[in-house]
């Protein structure tokens, strides 16, 4: 029998192992940051409202990390994984409400871990990685609106905020 405490522990271990592996392995094995990260750092140095290729949000977060951590490569790998595990958390929360079963919710995150875009491409913080949590939050708040079958200002507000941030 699987206990609720064990389920919670398994989820935490899954999240922490993803964070540890996908931050540490690229830091040890790569001799240079990925090109999209370097590009985002260059764009982030002047923080315009957009660039010829991408909206500004993917440059904003690396700049914040640069101001905090400086030229430490591991910090940018960590930034990328923080966005991924936050997405995992939102998917877990949505799956728990949708499936009404915590084991199935963890299984959904575990299956998500098997998708290429949630593991091998994640060391490179780019626009795709930056938008993942906001897409997940849009789906979560849309689900809340449909599931309740009543429209509340709070849910609409957060859906609008996360959709707008997702466009940035």
Language-model features and meaning:
Residues 120-130:
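Short acidic/glycine- and proline-prone juxtamembrane loop motifs at membrane-interface regions
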Residues 46, 155-168:
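Membrane-interface alpha helices of multi-pass inner-membrane proteins
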Residues 1-22, 153:
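Start-transfer (signal-anchor) and selected internal transmembrane alpha helices
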Residues 99, 138-158:
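Membrane-interface transmembrane helices that cradle and orient dolichyl/undecaprenyl
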Residues 62-66, 79-90, 115, 131-134:
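Transmembrane alpha-helices of multi-pass, membrane-embedded glycan-processing enzymes
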Residues 25-40, 50-64, 70-75:
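Extracytoplasmic catalytic/substrate-binding loops of multi-pass membrane glycan-assembly enzymes
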Residues 17-18, 105-113, 163, 167:
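Short helix- or helix-capping micro-motifs
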Residues 91-114, 132-133:
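Transmembrane-helix signature of polytopic, membrane-embedded enzymes
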């Amino acid at each position: 029998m699987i206990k609720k405490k064990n389920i919670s522990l398994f989820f935490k271990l899954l999240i922490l192992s993803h964070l540890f592996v996908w931050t540490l392995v690229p830091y040890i094995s790569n001799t240079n940051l990925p090109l999209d990260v370097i590009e985002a750092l260059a764009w982030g140095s002047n923080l315009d409202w957009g660039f010829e290729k991408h909206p500004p949000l993917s440059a904003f977060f690396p700049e914040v990390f640069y101001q905090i951590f400086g030229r430490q490569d591991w910090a940018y790998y960590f930034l990328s994984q923080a966005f991924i595990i936050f997405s995992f958390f939102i998917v877990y929360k949505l799956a728990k409400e949708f499936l009404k079963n915590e084991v199935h919710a963890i299984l959904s995150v575990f299956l998500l871990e098997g998708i290429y875009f949630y593991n091998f491409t994640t060391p490179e913080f780019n626009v795709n990685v930056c938008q993942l949590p906001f897409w997940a939050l849009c789906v979560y708040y849309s689900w809340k609106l449909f599931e309740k079958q009543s429209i509340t200002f709070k849910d609409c507000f957060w859906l609008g905020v996360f959709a707008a941030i997702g466009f940035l």
